[in-house]
């Protein structure tokens, strides 16, 4: 007879309750090395260490190709950032927000869904990688399409006369097909008259690529935001499954959106 069997009814004390949940995976880290630092950058910090949420239904536990491409592009084009107001939607690990701060943005507002773990992680990454005396990054939990006041308050307090954002970053968000209208409405309403939105994405579901691209048709036809393809490049896909779709999944698309004149 085993020790557990000899305990009789008391053995039940050692059974996991039906509602038992295992502890969540611990956060892990990814390193990003800046390879396009220009002399205009406010900081020459080269290595950025990002903490990623252990697991997240909102995909904040991965450093996606689109986020890396976005960071590279921003570092290569400091004129988009320096002295400007920047809004990042769906920031996840907030790499683009960090890059904007290091390039001397006047103010960066880094946002994502108001999930406590996700927002705490964004705060951690910013505090770990942006010098405190820069004082040019704020974070805000935000649901696309909701009241803009909390976002605008961050640039109003620095005395920005424009009242809107010079640059809005949407990195790897267009796979949320049901959210296209909200994303575009938010972008249209918060983008300064001469501002630009940077939209970068990879086709995570190759069969739905056309749905991804409908974002840009919708931007043009319903929201009067003009899409301009920057480029499409091929990088190693995030996942190795399904050889038949590997080429499509390796793509990274980058666009600008501007207000129709």
UniProtKB/Swiss-Prot annotation:
Residues engaged in binding S-adenosyl-L-methionine: 64, 90-92, 112, 144, 171
Positions of the UniProt region annotated as Disordered: 1-27
GO cellular component, one term: cytoplasm
Single GO BP term: methylation
Localization per Swiss-Prot or TrEMBL: Cytoplasm
Domain of life: Eukaryota
Gene3D superfamilies found in the cross-reference section: Vaccinia Virus protein VP39
Entry keyword annotation includes Cytoplasm: yes
Keywords: Cytoplasm, Methyltransferase, S-adenosyl-L-methionine, Transferase
InterPro entries: EFM7, Methyltransf_16, SAM-dependent_MTases_sf
Keyword Hydrolase attributed: no
GO molecular function terms listed in the Swiss-Prot or TrEMBL record: N-terminal protein N-methyltransferase activity; protein methyltransferase activity; protein-lysine N-methyltransferase activity; S-adenosylmethionine-dependent methyltransferase activity
EC number: 2.1.1.-
Protein family per UniProt: Belongs to the class I-like SAM-binding methyltransferase superfamily. EFM7 family.
Biological role: S-adenosyl-L-methionine-dependent protein methyltransferase that trimethylates the N-terminal glycine 'Gly-2' of elongation factor 1-alpha (TEF1 and TEF2), before also catalyzing the mono- and dimethylation of 'Lys-3'. May be involved in rDNA silencing and in lifespan determination.
HAMAP family assigned: Methyltr_EFM7 (MF_03223)
Note: Present with 7280 molecules/cell in log phase SD medium.
Name of the molecule in the record: Protein N-terminal and lysine N-methyltransferase EFM7
Source organism: Saccharomyces cerevisiae (strain ATCC 204508 / S288c) (Baker's yeast)
Phylogenetic placement of the source organism: Eukaryota, Fungi, Dikarya, Ascomycota, Saccharomycotina
């Amino acid at each position: 007879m085993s020790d557990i069997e000899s305990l009789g009814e008391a053995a039940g004390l050692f059974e996991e309750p039906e509602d038992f949940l295992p502890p969540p995976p611990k956060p892990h880290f990814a390193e990003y090395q800046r390879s396009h630092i220009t002399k205009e950058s406010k900081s020459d910090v080269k290595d950025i260490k990002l903490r990623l949420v252990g697991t997240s239904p909102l995909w904040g536990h991965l450093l996606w190709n689109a986020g890396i491409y976005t960071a590279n592009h921003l570092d290569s084009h400091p004129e988009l950032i320096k002295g400007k107001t920047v809004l990042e939607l769906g920031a996840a690990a907030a790499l683009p927000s960090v890059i904007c701060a290091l390039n001397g943005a006047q103010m960066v507002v880094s946002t994502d869904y108001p999930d406590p773990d996700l927002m705490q992680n964004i705060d951690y990454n910013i505090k770990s990688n942006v010098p405190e005396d820069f004082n040019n990054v704020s974070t805000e939990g935000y649901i696309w399409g909701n009241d803009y006041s909390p976002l605008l308050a961050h640039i109003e307090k620095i005395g920005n006369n424009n009242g809107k954002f010079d640059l809005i970053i949407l990195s790897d968000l267009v796979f949320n097909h049901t959210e296209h209208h909200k994303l575009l409405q938010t972008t249209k309403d918060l983008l300064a008259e001469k501002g630009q939105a940077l939209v970068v994405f990879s086709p995570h579901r190759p069969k739905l690529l056309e749905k991804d691209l409908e974002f840009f048709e919708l931007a043009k036809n319903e929201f009067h935001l003009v899409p301009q393809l920057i480029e499409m490049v091929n990088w190693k896909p995030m996942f190795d499954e399904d050889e038949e779709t590997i080429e499509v999944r390796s793509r990274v698309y980058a666009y600008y959106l501007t207000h129709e004149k």
